[in-house]
A protein has these predicted regions:
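Aromatic- and Gly/Pro-enriched helix-to-coil junctions and flexible linker segments
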Residues: 19-215
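Bacterial N-terminal signal peptides
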Residues: 4-17
Length: 215
């Protein structure tokens, strides 16, 4: 009896020690839960509409994975037609967007971090003073000419635009937000997409609108 009790006690101590030495595993960063809310708060003011800067639409997972383009949506002096690049409509999947000239901002390029990671790092390394006048060399407004560097052109961009990291012309991400996004990018920027499911109230409202518009 004593031997059994002693054996049980030793086993309990060993198990307790092993559990105590087990490293805590941080929960995986979720695009839907952790990343999209940051992009919505800090990025979509410039990167959400059809005419978003560099056509980089960060209002949805589809836009983030589509990437950026050097071709502006609106060109007043254009004399020939250009194929539209409407998200959700004119291409499906990353490869179709790559065929239309879009390049990734989420994928690492060999030993180089993702373009988004480097843009955020550039902005984080040169923070702006809150509630202060913007530096003269940061040009904003309707006549601003957006520069849309591809991943291989980032070093030249950073050299000529040292104060124009992302987010542009604002105080930027908090340290926690910056750490979360950079960790997600370093881990491969996996995007978990969740289908939008309307609530019962929203579904009823949609049905009401459809009935109204179909009369």
């Amino acid at each position: 009896m004593f031997f059994r009790l002693l054996t049980g006690a030793v086993t309990l101590v060993v198990c307790s020690t092993a559990l105590g030495q087990t490293p805590l595993v941080s929960p995986a960063i979720s695009y839907t839960r952790d990343i999209q809310p940051i992009l919505t708060e800090k990025c979509v003011a410039c990167h959400a509409c059809n005419d978003a800067a560099c056509q980089l639409n960060l209002g949805s997972a589809e836009g983030a994975t589509r990437g950026a383009s050097k071709v502006p949506v609106y060109q007043g002096d254009r004399t020939t037609a250009v194929a539209p690049t409407r998200i959700f409509y004119d291409a499906k999947g990353q490869q179709e967007w790559r065929n239309k000239g879009f390049y990734s901002v989420l994928d690492a390029q060999g030993a180089q971090a993702a373009l988004m990671a480097r843009m955020l790092e550039l902005g984080h390394s040169a923070p702006l003073t809150p509630n202060a006048k913007l530096p003269e060399d940061i040009v904003l407004g309707l006549n601003r000419e957006n520069v849309c560097p591809a991943p291989g052109e980032f070093n030249a961009y950073a050299q000529s635009h040292p104060k124009e990291g992302m987010p542009l012309a604002v105080t930027g991400l908090t340290d926690q937000q910056y750490s979360t996004v950079q960790t997600w990018l370093a881990q491969g920027a996996k995007v978990d997409q969740q289908a939008i499911k309307p609530t019962a109230v929203e579904a009823a409202q949609i049905a009401e609108w459809e009935e109204l518009f179909n009369r």
